[in-house]
A protein has these predicted regions:
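Short conserved segment of the HATPase_c
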Residues: 156-167
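Conserved glycine-rich
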Residues: 192-193, 197
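Conserved micro-motifs of the catalytic ATP-binding
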Residues: 67-72, 109-112
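Short acidic helix/loop segment immediately C-terminal to the autophosphorylated histidine
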Residues: 28-39
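Conserved catalytic submotifs in the C-terminal HATPase_c
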Residues: 74, 99-109
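Short alpha-helical segment of the dimerization/phosphotransfer core of two-component systems
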Residues: 44-52
Length: 212
């Protein structure tokens, strides 16, 4: 019942959030009549609203996964998917002087919903970026039956027993919804995949094992 409520609420919030974003954009279009202080306040509201939009999208996605609303499957080339994701985030990595390395150790093709496959890769890579060190490194390894995302990061290991919980606070940073790894876990459960976390030599590592 709780999951159903969250799903319904997330669906209903889409339109009001979109309306708010449009109205803010209209205000910005009137920038010549606004002071710098007013523009600064609008920018703060926009950042908060962007966060709420991301949060709502994640909640809606989790609700759809829970309700089995992704029945369509096809053969997904994970090697190509990882390359596209890396290219999409290239400028973001450069902003923090982070190095991205793709280790292509073998072809990995899996049968699953392509949108959900994209969510797994994107959320793992974004998690590595958010929790990685500026000037650090992210290494994504694609092998015949395994996807690994590792990053250098300050601090010790995360709480492996709760890191995939929804709204887990221990790993949450400013701007993060706290739902990315929960989405990864939900998709893996849906397809019977194994996702695990480890911490070795100052590196956080997430692995997803695919059945033969």
């Amino acid at each position: 019942r709780q999951k159903q409520f969250i799903g319904n609420a997330s669906h209903e919030m889409q339109t009001p959030l979109a309306v708010c974003r449009n109205r803010l954009e209209m205000l910005v279009d009137d920038a010549p009549t606004l002071t710098e202080e007013q523009l600064g306040e609008i920018a703060k509201v926009q950042r908060t609203l962007d966060y709420l939009v991301r949060l709502n999208r994640s909640l809606l996605l989790l609700s759809k996964i829970d309700n089995g609303q992704f029945p369509e499957t096809e053969a997904v080339d994970m090697n190509a998917l990882v390359r596209r994701t890396a290219e999409d985030m290239e400028e973001i990595y450069a902003y923090r002087n982070m190095r991205f390395t793709l280790a292509d150790e073998g072809p990995l093709t899996v049968r699953m919903n392509p949108s959900l496959a994209g969510s797994v890769v994107a959320n793992l890579v974004k998690n590595a970026f958010v929790h990685g060190d500026a000037g650090g490194e992210i290494v994504v390894t694609v092998a015949s039956r395994r996807l690994t995302v590792a990053n250098s990061g300050a601090g010790g290991p995360l709480d492996a027993g709760h890191i995939f919980d929804r709204f887990y606070q221990g790993a949450k940073k400013e701007g993060s919804t706290g739902l990315g790894l929960a989405v990864v876990d939900a998709v893996c459960r849906l397809y019977g995949l194994k996702v695990a976390y480890s911490h070795t030599d100052g590196r956080h590592c997430f692995t997803v094992d695919f059945p033969a």
